[in-house]
Amino acid sequence: MITTRLARMGALAPKSRLLFGTRGMATVADLDKKVEMCNLEKGNYINYKKMSENLDVVRRRLTRPLTYAEKILYSHLDDPQNQDIERGKSYLKLRPDRVACQDATAQMAILQFMSAGMPSVATPTTVHCDHLIEAQLGGEKDLARANEINKEVYDFLASSTAKYNIGFWKPGSGIIHQIILENYAFPGGLMIGTDSHTPNAGGLAIAAIGVGGADAVDVMAGLPWELKAPKVIGVRLTGEMSGWTAPKDIILKVAGLLTVKGGTGAIIEYHGPGVNSLSATGMATICNMGAEIGATTSLFPFNDRMYDYLKATKRQQIGDFARSYAKDLREDEGAEYDQLIEINLSELEPHINGPFTPDLATPISQFKEAVKANGWPEELKVGLIGSCTNSSYEDMSRAASIAQDALDHGLKAKSIFTVTPGSEQIRATIERDGQLKTLEEFGGVILANACGPCIGQWDRKDVKKGTPNSIVSSYNRNFTGRNDANPATHAFVTSPDLVVALSIAGTLNFNPLTDTLKDKDGKEFKLKAPTGDGLPSRGYDPGRDTYQAPPTDRSSVDVAVSPSSDRLQLLAGFQPWDGKDATGIPILIKCQGKTTTDHISMAGPWLKYRGHLDNISNNMLIGAVNAENGEANKIKNVFTGEYGAVPATARDYKARGVKWVVIGDWNYGEGSSREHAALEPRHLGGLAIITRSFARIHETNLKKQGMLPLTFSDPADYDRIPPDATVDLLCTELAVDKPMTLRVHPKDGASFDVKLSHTFNESQIEWFKDGSALNTMARKSGN
């Protein structure tokens, strides 16, 4: 059920209690303790006392119950006394506790930080090497190859992190989000990360938000971070899962209800008695995939399952400290949500979502019919489990139990089957406890502890590009061509349990809840429902040491960037606005339909250029469909009349000193946090991106780089814009809460005006005028 009115939690249901009981008011002595955020850093403490004091100020001002999401945000306000607070409207200035960067986005973030001229980061920061390892032959061989071909980038990251007091996780350590959950996330905290799936950490009751590199640089430099106060969507869970239903099915169901843009501008807050039946890592899975519905972040209230996970990962002292602050690590009685969804876990079916979009949700009982009705390729070519979304000990244990059931009947995977451990700790633990051996005997290829096929780092050989085929993964995202660069691949996402089951059958036309298989002797049998412990009974095995702490003396550390490098390039500042309206400028491309960050700045083979802005700009918008001809990467140059690639045409306009705009459709920039999708159009001379609507992170990234993200005040005006028109953009009209004018000059016909809306505030307008947020920072600091 979905309720779209303001929903008062306390009036709708009894408040689900913490299993260990809710304590009364914490004393000052309780909150005065010095408890470090993690075991790997010294001197960085959890400040529940300051959070509590900030909340007291806000409570006196608002005089109403607060959601848990609000508590975290308001407890991290830079100025709780004077901050305007209105959900969905105010811009909050916040002080995050941590920053995390993955290696593909860290390069540009650190290059920007270097240009700010500071000696070290002002906020605890880590960098994680997980995106640049391509899946080819298997874990160790792929890791060795990655270390060789990415040596220049890894050396840059290792030296720059050492120079600027940043923790560094080496290649092979694991995926950023799993490392954060295992080491850094803590209840009640606020962190940002340069990856859209940063909300994964919400499984430990922290508000973890994906941002672009420019936002990360602000926080690394000690500046407040700005976020439009999100609305809060409540998801109330009742009942308890059993059998083949997994935590993944909760978010697959929610994605189907809310769609890829239904969470935009909102935090998803899970609550209710059903929460206590989920493991901490199961909650992390749900929070991770909240990115697919556009949510700012997702989170759960602190409970005993989280305490158990903190204890298992050698952070019991954090769990004990959190218990002293427990009353503010959950929603208040009577807290109101802008929208409420209710899900009975006892009735929830396993789901499979896709293809081509993560919000096309189909219950397993209806999936065969959907396959037939839509003509999706029935044969399952590849099953893939793991990734940041589903690679916990519980996930791997349940998957191995199904694989063992098949092996006991003389069966192995019919489909190609791959396993991606989420971290070195997970890999070492499941190797010790036997799950890895079972999955290998089942036919699994064990990939490196890295992102791999989930982000397109997959040198796939079993089908030719352009050949229709089906793959099923436990990943989070399944946009066209994302995993294997084949636009004809039908990619579906589901739980690891169903991936294993379908891989045994080798077909999409299999429902393990009702269908039978034939064993080696031809006898029919049904797979047993998966089983597996949430935490290892013998504790976690940390495996190899893959962490590099910054040295105590950093004065002698040099960061070298070769001027001849094709992977790394020092940044030059963007030019400030000239103070004039832009007249007679071309529309570079009018994008038709879904235009994700994968369409704007592809990953896969382009990841190696993430530290070199000019080189990676050669992939700008090459995946976007041109509304003029229905083709990708084929647009008309208004000066030559010739058709060419989007980046080449943009470079020609830039060489002529001509600015340009892009016209976009709904939810433009959906997907990842990659700021390259904003840096590239700015670098190649773009002025504005004008759309029906934006995804949150991309809109902010464009503002940070001095671009104008604008929306049609009337979305129907998108259809009125001829792709070959020229336009005037009246930039001098830019003001808070005021519309702007786009004057359209069709090639044939009379000119007409279109009204444009925007979400700029005063400080963001400064970014545009100065040329970028980084320029504004430099101007104000005198650098």
Swiss-Prot record:
Catalytic function, reaction form: citrate = D-threo-isocitrate; (2R)-homocitrate = cis-homoaconitate + H2O
Region (Disordered): 524-555
Database matches in Pfam families: Aconitase, Aconitase_C
Comment on bound cofactor: Binds 1 [4Fe-4S] cluster per subunit.
Keywords carried by this UniProt record: Amino-acid biosynthesis, Iron, Iron-sulfur, Lyase, Lysine biosynthesis, Metal-binding, Mitochondrion, Transit peptide, Tricarboxylic acid cycle
Domain of life per record: Eukaryota
InterPro entries registered for this protein in UniProt: Acnase/IPM_dHydase_lsu_aba_1/3, Acoase/IPM_deHydtase_lsu_aba, Aconitase/3IPM_dehydase_swvl, Aconitase/IPM_isomerase, Aconitase_4Fe-4S_BS, Aconitase_4Fe-4S_dom, Aconitase_dom2, Aconitase_mito-like
GO molecular function, one term: single-stranded DNA binding
Required cofactor names: [4Fe-4S] cluster
Regions crossing the membrane: none
Function comment: Catalyzes the isomerization of citrate to isocitrate via cis-aconitate, a step in the citric acid cycle. Also catalyzes the reversible dehydration of (R)-homocitrate to cis-homoaconitate, a step in the alpha-aminoadipate pathway for lysine biosynthesis.
Name of this chain's protein: Aconitate hydratase, mitochondrial
